[in-house]
Amino acid sequence: MKTATITDSGSKPERKRSGILAGLSNLPIVNFLTSHSKKVTDSDGAEQESTLEGKIENLSMNFKNSAKGSNMHNALHISPYFIPGMQLGDILFTIAAVVAHSRRINVDCRIPWAYSEVTRELHAALGINALQSTLCGANEALAYEEESYLYTPIPETVSSGGLCGYFQSGNYFAGIEPIIRHLFAPLTAVDKTPGTVGIHITIGNDPYKYSKYRLCTALFLQKAAARLSKDIREVVVFSDKPCEAMAMLVEMPEFSKYSFRADSHKGCEQLHHMTSMQELVISNSALSWWAAWLGKPRKVIAPRCWFMHKAEQPPVFEDSPWIVL
């Protein structure tokens, strides 16, 4: 059995705002970046070593240099206004919502790619698919703030500046799904790994998440096991605390017939690996939601209760083939 290094995702720092930011006070954050070395080939055919951190550092400099002496940033445009503590899944929802709004009102969409390690890693992973950067890759002036976690259409009068929120609903980009899939295509695995099910389990140590989101229960996982296809042989565990998550599953009789493996990837690489699973059991997690939506696995099993508050529903399951328990 393989184990993985445990990295706690942390929580969010104090911010004094209304709307969607009002509940995010007194919450510390730790951003992380996973190093990944790979070979690249120069024009002479020689291999040279390159790291993701190096790419990100160069991209950050490019954001600053590209803004000098250029008038392109004066054109009317909107952009995501990222919030401290946002992780990859949150950022993808925000980008998708703002891209969709920009198309509805016919203005450009630019992204503050230099905002954090997570956004810089995402920019590097998207490559040529990445949208144009904001000035110096930073957040722009706040123009709109999401009122709550419920789906609320963005007013068409919002035609410039930064749009702040989590926008965790597929309704925000309904009608342009092919465009969003193309934009995020580099994050998606081409092939599936036969006989695998990816199970995402959030253990958590964040008091805000404990009060806001329902964590996966043993009962949910037991019900999910009963829905897996007969040809599934291996469980790949994706978690903020993979050792604890795997220990939970191993003790359940429903999973006794499977072999187990803990995924050790982070960020974009973890998302890419999740999309290669033949089937997925997702948690109350934006990242695993995107893995299911982008990866289109044969079967997706998702929790019905996403938030602790009954009035707030999970990101759109309507007209979905997902199995909701």
Predicted features, each with a name:
Residues 45, 54-55, 59-78, 114-232:
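Secretory-pathway luminal glycosyltransferase catalytic domains
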Residues 77-79, 108-114, 198-200, 236-238, ...:
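A structural signal for short, well-ordered beta-strand segments and their strand-loop junctions
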Residues 83-93, 209-210:
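A short, glycine/small-residue-rich beta-strand->loop->alpha-helix junction that serves as a flexible
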Residues 1-74, 129:
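Membrane-proximal basic amphipathic "stem/tether" segments
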Residues 119-131, 244-255, 312-317:
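Short, aromatic/basic amphipathic alpha-helical patches
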Residues 88, 228-303, 308-309:
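Donor-binding and catalytic core of enzymes assembling or modifying cell-surface/extracellular glycoconjugates
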Residues 309-325:
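Leloir-type glycosyltransferase catalytic cores
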Residues 93-102:
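Histidine-anchored nucleotide/phosphate-binding helix
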